[in-house]
Amino acid sequence: QPGVREAFCLQTCNRVEAYVVTDDAETGMAALDRYTAGLEGVRREMTHEASLEHLIRVACGLESLVLGEDQIIGQVRRAFVTASEAGGIGPVMEDAITKAIHVGERARAETGINEGVVSLGSAAVRLARRELDDLAAEDALVVGAGEMGTLAARALAGEVASLTVANRT
């Protein structure tokens, strides 16, 4: 789109975020309007330092449903590669995203934020163990074979009487 010098999109099971680099905020907002039309109440707009701080918090797992979850850092990396291959990454985005990945890795290494329950799937399994008398006697259904569904299925495997994974494809 005219006026957009760089663009990056992060899509996970819990979020879709778009970042653009433009010469002025108005051009950036107009570029993003194409993708957020009709999504009243779910859009958050940030500029400059606030957007970098947010991306760092996302990479650290501080904005995740499960604090410190590990999947997000890999998702940021993959989105960075995809945007790079598409020609969307320039010096501003490269600096911001590599900084966010570095801080996310460092936060995990130095704080242990990702110890224990590190995904929504493992949190669900922990809750099921607590709520059900005998998980080994239960049948389990995991809906979806994406990243979270796979993590949940792995966490449940061997702990339930039977495990079924349902997927739309």
What positions do the PLM features span?
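Short phosphate-engaging motifs
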Residues: 27-28, 72, 148
